[in-house]
Amino acid sequence: MSIEVIAQLASLALIIVLGPLVIGLLAARKGNL
């Protein structure tokens, strides 16, 4: 596998993992405020 493919897969995984995390943090902030 080339480095470019690995980088694309890594960025995709990051988006999939961080997406719900960020939404949860924003929801928690709104709930606290």
Curated annotation (Swiss-Prot):
<protein>
    <recommendedName>
        <fullName>Photosystem II reaction center protein Psb30</fullName>
    </recommendedName>
</protein>
<comment type="function">
    <text>A core subunit of photosystem II (PSII), probably helps stabilize the reaction center.</text>
</comment>
<dbReference type="InterPro" id="IPR010284">
    <property type="entry name" value="PSII_Ycf12_core-subunit"/>
</dbReference>
<keyword id="KW-0812">Transmembrane</keyword>
<keyword id="KW-0934">Plastid</keyword>
<dbReference type="GO" id="GO:0009535">
    <property type="term" value="C:chloroplast thylakoid membrane"/>
</dbReference>
<dbReference type="Pfam" id="PF05969">
    <property type="entry name" value="PSII_Ycf12"/>
</dbReference>
<keyword id="KW-0602">Photosynthesis</keyword>
<dbReference type="GO" id="GO:0009523">
    <property type="term" value="C:photosystem II"/>
</dbReference>
<keyword id="KW-1133">Transmembrane helix</keyword>
<keyword id="KW-0793">Thylakoid</keyword>
<dbReference type="GO" id="GO:0015979">
    <property type="term" value="P:photosynthesis"/>
</dbReference>
<keyword id="KW-0472">Membrane</keyword>
<feature type="transmembrane region" description="Helical">
    <location>
        <begin position="5"/>
        <end position="25"/>
    </location>
</feature>
<comment type="similarity">
    <text>Belongs to the Psb30/Ycf12 family.</text>
</comment>
<comment type="subunit">
    <text>PSII is composed of 1 copy each of membrane proteins PsbA, PsbB, PsbC, PsbD, PsbE, PsbF, PsbH, PsbI, PsbJ, PsbK, PsbL, PsbM, PsbT, PsbX, PsbY, PsbZ, Psb30/Ycf12, peripheral proteins of the oxygen-evolving complex and a large number of cofactors. It forms dimeric complexes.</text>
</comment>
<keyword id="KW-0604">Photosystem II</keyword>
<keyword id="KW-0150">Chloroplast</keyword>
